[in-house]
């Protein structure tokens, strides 16, 4: 298992409280929304859409939950080291999860399944990289997140032709939130990680509304 992630900068107690609370809120909200979203999607778009939306909400829940637990652990502990790897891995899962309902609902064809395969394939690669690379390059990991997110450009024609401007406007705005937030994450200044978390919450909320209610 990778050990290079142990060397991350120690954050203050206040920063870690802020980091934990921001994503704990997201985890609780997603857990509450899971049955509501799944039922609504089944009634409006059918079985495949319900499966896709469920995967999407579960992936967000796992991302928020792992982040919350990670930031609650004592710095330097084995538990925090393990949870850091899981926390970063769940970001891949959340990004791939956001593509799944869109493809299953709007692009139930070979190209759509290719996009899903690329997304989940990259997710598996990213998780293995986080776990087994001798030295994890954080900029490379961040680049993978952004590449996965902006692969949406490949499916924009299908999205625009089958949805309203509200849907794709919300999705693109969510993508921009992730991108802007990543800039705060990369700078490693005090409380910038919390700001990154807030951008993730905003992006997740926008894309949740788009996928569940406007797709």
Where are these regions (language model features)?
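Multi-pass alpha-helical transmembrane bundles in non-GPCR membrane proteins
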Residues: 1-215
